[in-house]
Amino acid sequence: MGIRTLRPYTPSTRHMTVSDFEELSRDENGKRPRPEKSLLQFIHRKKGRNNRGVITCRHRGGGHKRLYRIIDFRRDKRGIPGTVKTVEYDPNRSAHICLVEYEDGEKRYILAPRNLQVGSTIMAGPEAPFEIGNAMPLERIPLGTVVHNVELYPGRGGQMVRAAGAGAQVVAREGKYVSLKLPSGEVRMIRGECYATIGQLGNVDHNNISLGKAGRSRWLGRRPKVRGSVMNPVDHPHGGGEGRAPIGRSTPVTPWGKPTLGYKTRKRNKPSNKFIVRGRRRGGRRDKGGRAAQ
């Protein structure tokens, strides 16, 4: 994948960069194939609201209309080879997806690993060959391998390492658990029977793209964010004052008065703390209370 820089023929394109989409499939006329119709689904967009219509996540709404692509995160079609037919753009995620047609005729979308080509054969299962795009239990993957789409619980489907360019490394194996170094730097123990897909995800330059203008964020469904310091006191604890006034508190707070910007919100006695070997923040081993051990 490459990044194309636009000429500044308008102020908004001066700093705008776009992907050249070289990884995506095209037909003989240079056009992208249409998505598989049987794997498309309309999903009501929440716009940051809950079931009562109350805003629970600010700065969400609008954006271009999308159809959801049904992705096979479980990779539960075991022992049946499939052929990669296309590599496609997915508006619902940063990673690309590829359409796989299995020998029994079924078609599924999976996340597209880096360097997986059209025409490649993939498979899922304990006896699958060690190749990019194949899914197998973590206990059968050699140490040092980069994986993605990692399950946290057996059979639930991949829940971690699904963003563009992401990859987790298998660093240790102890008993029935396998330790993974996640993209955040955290080292976490996961059961060996959980499945993961071999390889790093494609579209690795996604984080280097500059949107260039506010309107491009609106296309993605991101609404403007207003700083609390420019609001009135009735709207935010940081608001009010003459001119550019300081916060006036010992720590920044949310619009509802709770500490923020560095304040830890994870529960100290969360049961899954015992599976975190090294935290992503301090780097130390966590004790039962979730604190980094000295």
Swiss-Prot record:
SMART domains: Ribosomal_L2, Ribosomal_L2_C. Coiled coil: none annotated. Keywords: Ribonucleoprotein, Ribosomal protein, RNA-binding, rRNA-binding. Part of the 50S ribosomal subunit. Forms a bridge to the 30S subunit in the 70S ribosome. The lineage of its organism: Bacteria, Bacillati, Cyanobacteriota, Cyanophyceae, Synechococcales. Residues 23-37 have a biased composition (Basic and acidic residues). This is Large ribosomal subunit protein uL2. Residues 264-285 have a biased composition (Basic residues). One of its GO terms (cellular component) is large ribosomal subunit. NCBIfam families: rplB_bact. GO terms for biological process: translation. The gene is rplB. Residues 1-37, 228-294 are annotated as: Disordered. One of the primary rRNA binding proteins. Required for association of the 30S and 50S subunits to form the 70S ribosome, for tRNA binding and peptide bond formation. It has been suggested to have peptidyltransferase activity; this is somewhat controversial. Makes several contacts with the 16S rRNA in the 70S ribosome. The keyword rRNA-binding applies. One of its GO terms (molecular function) is transferase activity. Belongs to the universal ribosomal protein uL2 family. InterPro entries: NA-bd_OB-fold (IPR012340), Rib_uL2_dom2 (IPR014722), Ribosomal_uL2 (IPR002171), Ribosomal_uL2_bac/org-type (IPR005880), Ribosomal_uL2_C (IPR022669), Ribosomal_uL2_CS (IPR022671), Ribosomal_uL2_dom3 (IPR014726), Ribosomal_uL2_RNA-bd_dom (IPR022666). The keyword RNA-binding applies.
